[in-house]
């Protein structure tokens, strides 16, 4: 039987997937900026006792390569997390479907699958947020 901890774990896993997606988007933006900016220019001193200055221009391959590698790793992590999330979702839905009380099924679905707050659930069901919280706590105490 699924316990409250697994339902909470499912909610946490949903948030983790969202965070990884945000990191992927941020990395993709960084890569796009590197590609857009193209070559970088730097000035170095050297020759003749260090009084001559040379301008060096080139594409920042090391940084670009690191970002690309990071992006691939994050995408692999996301795929793994999404698979785990789908497997856990099936378990959670089976557990909720096994609950006899229709109102409790609705409350559990809104709270753990739809990730709604107690206040949002209360508005839909017609209770205040503390009643929703107490109903969930009482359900898991049984």
Regions found by a protein language model. Give the residues of each.
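N-terminal interaction/assembly modules
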Residues: 1-95
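Short coil/turn residues that cap or connect secondary-structure elements
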Residues: 96-100, 131
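Short amphipathic alpha helix immediately N-terminal
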Residues: 100-114
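Short alpha-helical "recognition helix" segments of helix-turn-helix
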Residues: 120-125
